[in-house]
Amino acid sequence: MKADGGTMERRYWIGVVSRSHIMIGTEGSFVQLNHGKREPLRRFHAGDGLLIYSPRESYPDGAPLQAFTAAGIIRTGEIYQGDMGDGFMPFRVDVDYLPCHETPIRPLIDELSFIRKKKSWGAAFRFGLLQVPEQDFALITGAMECTFPAGFFKDPPAA
């Protein structure tokens, strides 16, 4: 909550996850970022929008993909650890993923305001999690043909 007692304003995020890893996440309704680190997940709040950008099919040496592969809404923002076996206990948050179509990034680059340097656009994703403006989030999810609940967007995208 804000200091004035109001609710948190919804934020919009892009997480960077290989396609093979996010397929596990969508199946289990969770996301883990930056090799299971806790810190990036602390930025999420219930109701935030989340997009997944997959630079590769699989990590670390999979074929290049460069596509948005999943979209959803952060469920509670509560961080917990999952058990992936062999002692790997990554931190996660639950996500309500929505039906979407995988969408390549390249046709969208010129329209995305968070990508300032269009020729070196990949640099925008180097930290594994970035907050983006609602308009960019809506543009990408529109290209993915995602349907968010009524009232999700403060400024709904034009139909």
Model features per residue range: what roles?
Residues 46-49, 58:
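Short, intrinsically disordered low-complexity segments
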Residues 119-157:
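C-terminal terminal-subdomain/extension
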Residues 54-60:
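Short, charged beta-turn/beta-strand-edge "cap" motif at the junction between a beta-strand
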Residues 64-130, 134-135:
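Aromatic- and Lys/Arg-enriched surface recognition patch
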Residues 41-45, 61-66:
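Short, conserved, surface-exposed binding loops centered on an aromatic residue
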Residues 1-46, 144-149, 153-159:
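Compositionally biased, charged N-terminal/linker segments
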Residues 51-52, 69:
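Hydrophobic beta-strand signal
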Residues 12, 49, 92:
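Beta-strand-rich binding-surface signature
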